[in-house]
Regions:
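Flexible glycine/proline-rich
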Residues: 1-147
């Protein structure tokens, strides 16, 4: 995905301290084991922001007992052309304009954090897909991603 690499996720199993309360055992583990999860986010600020919103936040919500953690996307008109298709799923910073369509932040570099302040959300652009003006695209509002 772009922006958002590299992303690391894992779990470390450890023996619970004597007398300590262990978490509920998962399949194949004993009651005396506990799991600690870790996430490694990318170094560029926009990459970290996007991967946190799409992967880490939903994971933390699920750990907290939430069930419906998937953000609801809306379909909006692209008022721009993105001729260069990327081989990866790309999340473009965009905002809703006065006409109700979407406009792109001019610089989609993962180092430009101001694109996240300027924008209203992310366009979820599938791999190898160029966007034409007037096309309907999948938009994830920050209000959905941030809760």
């Amino acid at each position: 995905m772009k922006p958002g690499k590299p992303l690391a996720f894992g779990a470390v199993r450890r023996q619970a301290a004597s007398g300590a309360q262990a978490s509920a055992p998962s399949e194949g583990s004993s009651a005396m084991e506990a799991e600690t999860f870790f996430v490694g986010l990318p170094g560029n600020p926009v990459s970290s922001f996007v991967t946190f919103l799409l992967f880490v936040r939903p994971f933390l919500l699920r750990l907290g007992g939430a069930h419906d953690v998937a953000p609801r996307a809306i379909s909006l008109r692209a008022d721009f052309t993105q001729a260069k298709a990327d081989r990866r799923n790309e999340f473009l910073r965009a905002r809703i304009n006065a006409a109700g369509g979407l406009e792109l932040f001019p610089n989609q570099s993962s180092a430009v954090l101001t694109s996240t302040v300027w924008g209203d959300g992310l366009i979820d652009n599938p791999p190898n897909h160029a966007i034409s003006a007037g096309e309907t695209v999948r938009f994830l509002p920050f209000s959905e991603l941030l809760g």
